[in-house]
UniProtKB/Swiss-Prot annotation:
The protein's name: Pulmonary surfactant-associated protein D
Assembly, per entry: Oligomeric complex of 4 set of homotrimers.
Collagen-like domain: residues covered: 45-221
GO biological process, one term: innate immune response
Composition-biased stretches (Basic and acidic residues): 49-64, 203-215
Extra remark: Pulmonary surfactant consists of 90% lipid and 10% protein. There are 4 surfactant-associated proteins: 2 collagenous, carbohydrate-binding glycoproteins (SP-A and SP-D) and 2 small hydrophobic proteins (SP-B and SP-C).
Length: 374
């Protein structure tokens, strides 16, 4: 009966108080089942009806994790996530097969001109070109020095008779002439009596002049004509000696080419323009000055044989862009490379010849092969 009353008290207690009471009971240990109602020992009565379910108690403390359950089935794939950051480049793969040739793109704009490249190796020697037309006749050179007198020439042919000279002064009386030949005998006269020998008779008158004789051979020329001949021969001898000296000096150069009256010789050295010019002058010549395609081809053969460009004698030191020979004469022949002369850098006053025979203006301080002209 007491149990029943206890249960009844609990049921009629307000829900707020019951929750507070339940909370109090959960925080302290229950020492006596009869805290709310004074209990006394009685006999057990009939069981009461089931009471109504109480409110859910407060959440208890989190318990220890249980044992892992079996792995569930894979869920459906979630939606595609955003693109992640770019990863590091992977190692290079093997090259794929060559693709088909693409369409030709439009031509690009011209690039900036690069620096001038180094001079390429000399090309093979080309064939000698056809002989050019003869150039105009050059100006007469300065008169040479009077040569040494030559040897006595042979007697010349008999010249025509000169005009009759003036009558000379009478000469001194000559010695008496020899007795003339006896005349023919006259007819015999009667025999006379021999008389005494008489005195010598007077000298007879001078006879009439005889006919003019044949003209004799011409004698030696007078001293003035002889002197002129000696001076002319002396000049020829000096010119021959000078020519022989030039050929003798030219023979000191290792190789050369002959064109007409000119000889081109190459030295085994490379010099600046002024030193090269002086070297040729001391040898009795000058730097090569080709005045025709034939002469230019001869110089080209020497340049090709040495595989080096060479200086020519022409410069534009006097007037920029106007190249002349050492004598100041304007060029009668040229073989400039395309775009030359261009005075690159503002200091190209000399001329060099390439292995292809073309010309280029060059700084005179550069070193080039020495080729002299004799």
């Amino acid at each position: 009966m007491l149990h029943f009353l206890s249960m009844l008290v609990l049921l009629v207690q307000p829900l707020g108080d019951l929750g507070a009471e339940m909370k109090t009971l959960s925080q302290r240990s229950i020492t006596n089942t009869c805290t709310l109602v004074l209990c006394s020992p009685t006999e057990n009565g009939l069981p009461g009806r089931d009471g109504r379910d109480g409110r859910e108690g407060p959440r208890g403390e989190k318990g220890d994790p249980g044992l892992p359950g079996p792995m569930g089935l894979s869920g459906l794939p979630g939606p595609r996530g955003p693109v992640g950051p770019k990863g590091e480049n992977g190692s290079a793969g093997e090259p794929g097969p060559k693709g088909e040739r693409g369409l030709v793109g439009p031509p690009g704009s011209p690039g900036i001109s690069g620096p001038a490249g180094k001079e390429g190796p000399s090309g093979k020697q080309g064939n000698i070109g056809p002989q050019g037309k003869p150039g105009p006749k050059g100006e007469a050179g300065p008169k040479g020095e009077v040569g040494a007198p030559g040897m006595q020439g042979s007697a010349g042919a008999k010249g025509p008779a000169g005009p009759k000279g003036e009558r000379g002064a009478p000469g001194e009386q000559g010695a008496p002439g020899n007795a003339g030949a006896a005349g023919p005998a006259g007819p015999a006269g009667p025999q006379g009596a021999p008389g005494s020998r008489g005195p010598p008779g007077l000298k007879g008158d001078r006879g009439a002049p005889g006919d003019r004789g044949i003209k004799g051979e011409s004698g030696l020329p007078d001293s003035a004509a002889l002197r002129q001949q000696m001076e002319a021969l002396n000049g020829k001898l000096q010119r021959l000696e000078a020519a022989f000296s030039r050929y003798k000096k030219a023979a000191l150069f290792p190789d050369g080419q002959s064109v007409g009256d000119k000889i081109f010789r190459a030295a085994n050295s490379e010099e600046p323009f002024e030193d090269a010019k002086e070297m040729c002058r001391q040898a009795g010549g000058q730097l090569a000055s080709p005045r025709s395609a034939t002469e230019n081809a001869a110089v080209q053969q020497l340049v090709t044989a040495h595989s080096k460009a060479a200086f020519l004698s022409m410069t534009d030191v006097g007037t920029e862009g106007k190249f002349t020979y050492p004598t100041g004469e304007a060029l009668v022949y040229s073989n400039w490379a395309p775009g030359e002369p261009n005075n690159n850098g503002g200091a190209e006053n000399c001329v060099e010849i390439f292995t292809n025979g073309q010309w280029n203006d060059k700084a005179c301080g550069e070193q080039r092969l020495v080729i002299c002209e004799f």
